[in-house]
Amino acid sequence: MKTLKTMLMALAFIAAPAAIRAQASADAPAATVTDLDQKYATDLLKAGTDAPDITLNTIDGKPFALKDLRGRYVVLDFWASWCPDCRKDSPFIMQLYKKFGAKGVAFVGVSFDKNLESWKNGVAKLGIEYTQVSDLKPMRESPVAKAYHIGWIPTIYVIDPQGKVALATVVSDKVSAYLHSVYPDCAE
């Protein structure tokens, strides 16, 4: 009997740490979208920072300057046609464009495609209707990517009417929440 008691106590001492670890991981919250910003958005420009101007050509070769959109909210969607996460987010960004574009919010896609035809095909395939610009340089070589501290795509910035960063994130749901806070009359 004493041996059985000793064995049970030893087993309890051995099993206790494993049970505690199992309970701790069961109590831990599942990975959240906030974790993505903590992982990929830590170096992005902070809210209140002046948004660097973007002067690039549109997909049809016309000049574009971000400063021309002063006085409006602007959503800058940094993406590329070869990026699976960008393609996954694209329909949601289009929904936001259709909803908030009607309120005067400008949407601008900043592509890191290197090839004009690939870029055009990506825009057509995804059905993107808002303004698209690019310097046709890879993200690591693009002055725009450097100015906006882009290290991961998709990355989305919201620029306020005064030309300041209002939001910088890799989570499209945060863009939706922010725009809904600015335009509460738009139903979720």
Where do the language-model regions lie?
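N-proximal helix/coil linker or "cap" segments that precede and/or mark the start of modular domains
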Residues: A22-D53, N121-A124
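Active-site acidic short loop of glycosyltransferases
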Residues: R70-R72, A102, I128, I150
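Conserved redox-active cysteine motifs that mediate thiol-disulfide chemistry
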Residues: G71, F78-Q95
